[in-house]
Amino acid sequence: MSQLQKGLSLGTKFTLTFGSALLALFPAFAHVTVNPKEAPAGSYAKLTFRVPHGCDGSPTTRLRIQIPEGATSVKPMVHPLWEIETVKKPLETPYESHGRMITETVAEVIWSGGRLPDEFMDEFSISLKLPDRPGETLPIPVVQECEEGIYRWIQVAQPGEDPHDLPEPAPLLKLTGGADAHGQGHGHSHGHSHSHPTP
C-alpha cells in the first residue's frame, strides 16, 4: 500500500470515527431543552427553552409551553417578531399577593406569528415561581408547530426506562433544596383567558 493509500485509509477511518461521535452526541442537542437544568424549589427562576431545529426542514411557527402544576407568577419574555398569548386556569387554592387575591394562574404560554428557519436556533424565556417540592423533577411539556409538521416534546421516561431512548422527550427541571423565594421574576402575568388545549 502506498503512502497516499495509507493516508486516505487513515483519513477515512478518522472521518467515520468522528462522524460516529457526532451522531452519538447529536441526539442530546436535537430536542427542545430547558436551561437551567435545576433550580431551588419555591424560588423565582428564569427558564430558557432552546429550539435547535424545525420539523424535518420546515420552519417553526408556533411554540407552546405548558407550565408545571404548582408554579405561579408566570411571565413570558417578549420576543421580537413573535406574538405572546397566555392560557389561564383557576387556582385550587387562591392566595394573597401585594394586597390582592390571586385566583388564577398561567397554564400555558404560546409564542406564534414568527418564523424560525430549520437552519437556525432560537431561545424563548419565561420567569415564574417554582413549586416548593424539593427533590422533584418537573417535566415541562413543549409543543413545537411548524409550517409542515409538529413535534410534541411531552414524553417522560418511566421507571427503568432510559430517557435517551425517547424520540420526543419533555424538557426536565430538577427542584433542589428550598429557597427563600427571593430573586428575579417578581410580578404576575396578565394574559387572555382561554380553555387549556391538550398537546
Language-model-derived ranges and their functions:
Residues 44-82:
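Low-complexity, serine/threonine/proline/glycine-rich extracellular segments that form mucin-like
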Residues 29-51:
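N-terminal edge beta-strand
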Residues 178-199:
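Histidine-centered metal-binding segments
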Residues 25-27:
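N-terminal signal peptide c-region/cleavage motif recognized by signal peptidases
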Residues 149-167:
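Beta-sandwich strand segments
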Residues 2-18:
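Bacterial N-terminal signal peptides that target proteins for export
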